[in-house]
Amino acid sequence: MSMSTSTEVIAHHWAFGIFLIVAIGLCCLMLVGAWFLGGRARARYKNTPFESGIDSVGTARLRLSAKFYLVAMFFVIFDVEALYLFAWSTSVREVGWLGFIEAAIFILVLLAGLVYLVRIGALEWTPSRSRRERLNTEEAGSLTNRHTQ
């Protein structure tokens, strides 16, 4: 006796369906429980920030330098690349020399990207002088070195 296609699908995926129903139910239960059990502030100062008894001065918004976001993006990018290298390292015997060559090319591309980031100054935290000023300073230093030799 053969089962119909829909019965086979249900037989194979019933556990996932139950998991999905329980997960959604648990989320709803926590939201409803927090709504019933949570405290309610119905005062005039409900939406003002708590400053430990001190009157707040100025705005609560902070301006962060874009360098923080760049470092975070570089971290994520290089972290994902490390994940790829870890996956490669676990299967190094199966992929053989071809996999090794591909990983070496991948690492060289990463190094080229890192060199590019250093060259454009994306990793410099100090206030930078203009490129023209740096070049003039380097040229002046090399000229004085030539004259002293």
From Swiss-Prot:
Any one of the GO CC terms: plasma membrane
Membrane topology: Multi-pass membrane protein
Keyword Cell membrane: yes
Keywords: Cell inner membrane, Cell membrane, Membrane, NAD, Quinone, Translocase, Transmembrane, Transmembrane helix, Transport, Ubiquinone
Any single Pfam family the record assigns to this protein: Oxidored_q4
Top-rank EC class of the record's enzyme: translocase
InterPro entries referenced in this protein's UniProt entry, alphabetically: NAD(P)H_OxRDtase_bac/plastid, NADH_UbQ/plastoQ_OxRdtase_su3, NDAH_ubi_oxred_su3_sf
TM helices/strands, residue ranges: 16-36, 68-88, 98-118
A single MF term (Gene Ontology): quinone binding
Reactions that this protein is recorded to catalyse: a quinone + NADH + 5 H(+)(in) = a quinol + NAD(+) + 4 H(+)(out)
EC number from the UniProt entry: 7.1.1.-
Subcellular location(s) per record: Cell inner membrane
Primary residence: membrane
Subunit (UniProt): NDH-1 is composed of 13 different subunits. Subunits NuoA, H, J, K, L, M, N constitute the membrane sector of the complex.
Family classification: Belongs to the complex I subunit 3 family.
Function per UniProt: NDH-1 shuttles electrons from NADH, via FMN and iron-sulfur (Fe-S) centers, to quinones in the respiratory chain. The immediate electron acceptor for the enzyme in this species is believed to be ubiquinone. Couples the redox reaction to proton translocation (for every two electrons transferred, four hydrogen ions are translocated across the cytoplasmic membrane), and thus conserves the redox energy in a proton gradient.
Protein name: NADH-quinone oxidoreductase subunit A
Upper classification of the organism: Bacteria, Pseudomonadati, Pseudomonadota, Gammaproteobacteria, Enterobacterales
Gene: nuoA
